[in-house]
Amino acid sequence: MIKISRKQYASMYGPTTGDKVRLGDTNLFAEIEKDYTLYGEEIKFGGGKTIRDGMAQSASTYTNELDAVITNAMIIDYTGIYKADIGIKGGKIVGIGKAGNPDTQDSVNEAMVVGAATEVIAGEGQIITAGGIDTHIHFISPTQIPTALYSGVTTMIGGGTGPAAGTNATTCTPGKWNMHQMLRAAESYAMNLGFFGKGNSSNEEGLEEQIKAGALGLKVHEDWGSTPAAINHALNVAQKYDVQVAIHTDTLNEAGCVEDTMKAIDGRTIHTFHTEGAGGGHAPDIIKAAGEPNILPASTNPTIPFTKNTADEHLDMLMVCHHLDKKIKEDVAFADSRIRPETIAAEDTLHDMGIFSITSSDSQAMGRVGEVITRTWQTADKCKNEFGALKEECGENDNFRIKRYISKYTINPAIAHGISEYVGSVEVGKFADLVLWKPSMFGIKPEMILKNGMIVAAKIGDSNASIPTPEPVVYAPMFGSYGKAKYNCAITFVSKIAYDCHIKEELGLERILLPVKNCRNITKKDMKFNDVITPIEVNPETYEVRVNNTKITSKPVEKVSLGQLYCLF
């Protein structure tokens, strides 16, 4: 038997079981738990390599030949951290394991035959993750979509109609006409999209109309009046049509305090946006909601991780996004009530404890649409550096923490909004929304983004160069983003009632439309690696946060990982 060193093996086929990989310039190390490829039978494309006719590429005719295979990929997912080939057919993941030619190789997965029909994407030395899911989008500008895509986000859920005052402040697409217009606009993009209707109404017929018009859920926002009545009516309609309700609660406590909101919610499942409160919500103690079993708590990315500049930058953001005036003292007091360093300091720690379940952006409305993934990993790194390894870790690695944090922007938002059957993880049967990263660039600069198995965006060099790599290397849309291909590379998520009533045909849409499902029968316990339920207390005078009588806080950092080292500007 021929043996080679681990270093030589990794340089040829990527790391294998027991190897550790550093994520970007963070202090996080992922260790491969299992290698599903077969030593000596690895498949690899290139001159003198194995994917050639009659070798690792079958010369026989198989009906299950793959459309594409990602070879020797290191997968980081809530399901595990492991090495495998990924087989793609018809836009979906059909196999994870050993791909190749069953006529000449052992242990080839019968669903993963490489043949004349198969394109090869080299995964050696790359990390593969599921595409990110951002569930807090203000659709203020369509230019957000490529920015998010180039960061590794493949699904955007939110509301709005453009740079209107209502959209600048709230994630709502109000009414049937606006909803239909946004569904039509979605046709232009190789990005999964879904839209919230406006959930603030004591008239349930108006809410139902929006669900029937194609809304995948409702958003209740304080700028429209997050009253107990509005909350109750929105949840009534959501229960009826199996959609999710997202909420931005009442900062000013005009219609009630956090206890009144929880009473109106009445144990029903709801997705709470920016649950820390700087982005909005009952001052000073909306953060208490994060510990409840029916609350799916999320953060928006300006407050994570907590840095020396976090509190200062929030005041100006708030004045702009919520149509406030610095010359009006009541507006300034409103802004000041939301920016509390004590609760912001607790937020990172609550994420690390698995109490906060989801991260999102709040795009252009106190949030950065291209930084969900980056800030999630910055927070993970900050917490490791401050608090050390989690007690759940096994061995000299950070695998548990890594699974906890990747779940926050992949599987958990998918579960929360009823789309986890389709996207949110690297699993057989799901659409192949996948992101490839060099380990050194992990979390900030992806190499390539696949939607439904086709490359829709990637880093690419000078188009007039003789090879693909010369500078300037920039992100650009790829063929999956063009022509009619984009209709098969992206999904619009709608309510089941709209899907069943053939909204696609009614509006003449060409994209894939799919219904959300199982939004109402989930709880915090369904949040992967982030399901901790515990009482949280907030001191109303000092804003100190406590869990089990222990003060929860963290220090503001002077410098973050995945920062200026990777960015010219």
From Swiss-Prot:
Induction of synthesis: By nickel ions.
Binding-site list for substrate: 221
Location in the cell: Cytoplasm
Pfam families the UniProt entry points to: Amidohydro_1, Urease_alpha
Annotated metabolic or biological route of this protein: Nitrogen metabolism; urea degradation; CO(2) and NH(3) from urea (urease route): step 1/1
UniProt entry tagged with the keyword Metal-binding: yes
Entry's Gene Ontology BP terms: urea catabolic process
Cofactor(s) named in the record: Ni cation
Known EC number: 3.5.1.5
Post-translational modification: Carboxylation allows a single lysine to coordinate two nickel ions.
Binding positions for Ni(2+) 2 per the UniProt entry: 219, 248, 274
Top-level EC class as recorded in UniProt: hydrolase
Similarity-based family: Belongs to the metallo-dependent hydrolases superfamily. Urease alpha subunit family.
Protein name, as recorded: Urease subunit beta
Organism name: Helicobacter hepaticus (strain ATCC 51449 / 3B1)
